[in-house]
């Protein structure tokens, strides 16, 4: 098996952060292993890192490195073999009318306002519900890899712009797509989050890419449960990708 000191990763250095409060499991401390320097993490290197369980937040490339805890498990959907279940088919039917536009990373006030609306409705008190424009930009709009911003809007007559319902940031890798972050209209009667994953799976198939990386799945975290509902998928356990159940 290749190691972190093999090409092309031997040019990178890895360090562990100090402990900080875990965002997902209460009363636990987390640590991250961070890859540096960021200017050397271009698309090919980043693809290799993601396949080894890393992901990014802005220019920060990391993976969990917690003391005595391995709850965060990287998960990727096998796009070519994916078959939706009944609820996923409903979500696709409900929202397939949305019109998409794929863009380079860019700041738009409309995107930022939807981001704040989403954070305040879904993650109130979590800190991100008061993110400044600079914080939003650093989190989502800074990248050295092959990243895209996707708008999802209601259909509108010619010459008009439909209501913005969802924005997704994704990275295009050598072997798949990596879901960086998605925010959307928090209407409880809609299934925008599920539809977004389905859309990314369909895009991966169209591009001939094998995987959609959904980040980390935590069995004990209710907010992470949705990831394991996309079958078939693989989990990275003890350094190896294994088929999930």
Curated annotation (Swiss-Prot):
It comes from the Bacteria. Belongs to the R-transferase family. Bpt subfamily. Its EC number is 2.3.2.29. This is Aspartate/glutamate leucyltransferase. Pfam families: ATE_C, ATE_N. The keyword Metal-binding does not apply. GO terms for cellular component: cytoplasm. One of its GO terms (biological process) is ubiquitin-dependent protein catabolic process via the N-end rule pathway. Its main location: cytoplasm.
């Amino acid at each position: 098996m290749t190691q972190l000191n093999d090409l092309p990763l031997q040019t990178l250095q890895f360090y562990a952060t100090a402990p900080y409060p875990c965002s997902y499991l209460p009363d636990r401390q987390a640590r991250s292993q961070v890859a540096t320097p960021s200017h050397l993490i271009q698309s090919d290197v980043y693809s290799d890192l993601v396949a080894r369980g890393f992901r990014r937040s802005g220019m920060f490339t990391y993976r969990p490195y917690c003391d005595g805890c391995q709850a965060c498990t990287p998960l990727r959907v096998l796009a070519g073999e994916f078959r939706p279940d009944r609820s996923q088919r409903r979500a696709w039917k409900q929202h397939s009318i949305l019109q998409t536009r794929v863009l380079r990373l860019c700041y738009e006030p409309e995107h930022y306002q939807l981001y704040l609306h989403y954070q305040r409705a879904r993650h109130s008190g979590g800190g991100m519900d008061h993110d400044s424009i600079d914080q939003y930009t650093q989190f989502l709009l800074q990248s050295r890899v092959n990243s895209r911003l996707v708008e999802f809007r209601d259909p509108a007559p010619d010459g008009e712009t439909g209501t913005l319902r969802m924005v997704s940031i994704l990275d295009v890798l050598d072997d798949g797509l990596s879901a960086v972050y998605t925010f959307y209209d928090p209407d409880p009667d809609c299934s925008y989050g599920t539809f977004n994953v389905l859309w990314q799976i369909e895009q991966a198939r169209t591009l001939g890419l094998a995987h959609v990386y959904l980040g980390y799945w935590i069995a004990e975290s209710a907010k992470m449960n949705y990831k394991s509902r996309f079958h078939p998928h693989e989990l990275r356990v003890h350094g190896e990708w294994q088929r999930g159940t």
